UniProtKB/Swiss-Prot annotation:
HAMAP family: PhnX. The active site is at 10 (nucleophile), 51 (schiff-base intermediate with substrate). InterPro entries: HAD-like_hydrolase_sf, HAD-like_sf, HAD_sf, PGP-like_dom2, Phosphonoacetald_hydro. Homodimer. Mg(2+) binds at residues 10, 12, 184. This is Phosphonoacetaldehyde hydrolase. GO terms for cellular component: cytosol. It is an enzyme of class 3 (hydrolase).
């Protein structure tokens, strides 16, 4: 393509791990180990952030902070966040490979992008240790990006644009408007907006829907419709220029953005 130069994907819930399920059990188990219960819905709230800020956000929830204070006699502080994080990371690493299945359609879209001379980048809220468990399996299934930028590679994670700014030069792209960020989380969409890229939300395969593929397929049509509408509205409220069900639906959006850039439009 002449105008679109790069697509930057998130990982969990966008290209692997349908429903973004891997971190959820790890978060719940970790807090349970400290004698504080959290729900899956609570755990999902800050998804897309780096994992230590994610834990900090969970511990700042009034109900969780009160439960922590009841258990330990003080409000959660930095040392407590570190303690929870140190327990969480090995749990996430342990399950990551089990949730590295590439989401249907991703490999075909990656091939189509390469056929159009579009570079493929990725950013993630995962650490490099966690990604080491995911990348080989994804590559074997047909998804191997040109760039992977992880939590810890930049001064701040999402919603800051630092990971975008690191990715673009690695892809040889210097105009952010020529890139598309694809993400299933609100902070991931904000990352793209803050970085000056086009932003495409993924509603059904990711965190906003939060269900395994088989469970999604089993939903009654009316329930699927309202869940999809709610997920779409969340991502649009975060600033997404487009919202698709999954990456399998991406190529028509890429062509539309190509046409808009040709007309002189900007994100």
């Amino acid at each position: 393509m002449k105008h679109v130069k790069a697509v930057i994907f998130d990982w969990a819930g966008t290209v692997v791990d349908y429903g973004s399920l891997a971190p959820m059990g790890a978060f719940v188990e970790t807090f349970e180990q400290f004698g504080v219960s959290i729900t899956i819905d609570e755990a999902r709230g800050p998804m897309g952030m780096a994992k230590r800020p994610h834990i900090a956000a969970l511990m700042a929830l009034p109900r969780v902070a009160q439960a922590w204070a009841d258990k330990y006699g003080h409000a959660p502080g930095e040392a407590d966040i570190d303690a929870v994080y140190d327990v969480f990371v090995p749990k996430n690493i342990a399950v990551a490979a089990s949730y590295s299945s590439v989401i249907p359609g991703v490999a075909d879209v990656a091939s189509a992008l390469r056929s159009d001379d579009i570079r493929i980048g990725t950013t993630t809220g995962y650490t490099r240790e966690i990604m080491a468990e995911i990348v080989p399996g994804a590559a074997a299934q047909g998804f191997s990006p040109d760039s992977i930028v992880c939590t810890g590679d930049t001064p701040e994670g999402r919603p800051s644009p630092y990971m975008i700014y690191k990715t673009l030069p690695e892809l040889g792209v210097w105009r952010a408007k020529d890139a598309i960020k694809v993400d299933d989380t609100e902070v991931g969409i904000e990352e793209g907006i803050n970085g000056g890229t086009w932003a495409v939300g993924v509603a059904v395969s990711g965190n906003a829907f939060g269900m395994a593929e088989n469970d999604v397929k089993a939903l009654a049509p009316h329930e699927f419709a309202w869940r999809r509408k709610a997920a779409t509205e969340k991502l649009k409220a975060a600033g997404a220029h487009y919202v698709i069900d999954s990456v399998a639906d991406l190529m028509p959006v890429v062509y539309d953005i190509e046409a808009r850039l040709a007309r002189g439009e900007r994100p």
